[in-house]
């Protein structure tokens, strides 16, 4: 399993709710149809910071998801809400455990 963490800084605080709604209603249904998709989380990390974590089967699929998300942000004209490119960390998951009871 491969994970991509994207840290977005400089988020327009007054539009965070709008962004989260668009991610949930528009991006996530499309992202979840990409090959190898395993999971996605959006995190309100700080006053002007949001992070996302996505999980895919392979490194190539995870890389494609990063391109897909960047394209989606442009399509949705969210450059004013998310003005900076994300700081990206990606790699293979080497240890993980869930209990299956997590709820957002």
Predicted features along the sequence, with ranges:
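Short S/T/G/P-rich N-terminal loop/turn motif that feeds into the first structured element of a domain
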Residues: 1-50, 57-71, 80-104
């Amino acid at each position: 399993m491969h994970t991509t963490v994207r840290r977005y800084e400089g988020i327009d605080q007054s539009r965070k709710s709008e962004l989260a709604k668009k991610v949930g209603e528009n991006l996530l249904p499309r992202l979840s149809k990409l090959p190898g998709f395993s999971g996605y989380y959006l995190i309100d990390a700080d006053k002007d910071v949001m992070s996302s974590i996505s999980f895919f089967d392979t490194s190539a699929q995870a890389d494609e998801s990063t391109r897909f998300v960047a394209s989606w942000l442009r399509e949705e004209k969210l450059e004013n809400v998310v003005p900076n490119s994300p700081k990206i960390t990606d790699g293979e998951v080497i240890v993980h455990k869930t209990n299956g009871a997590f709820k957002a």
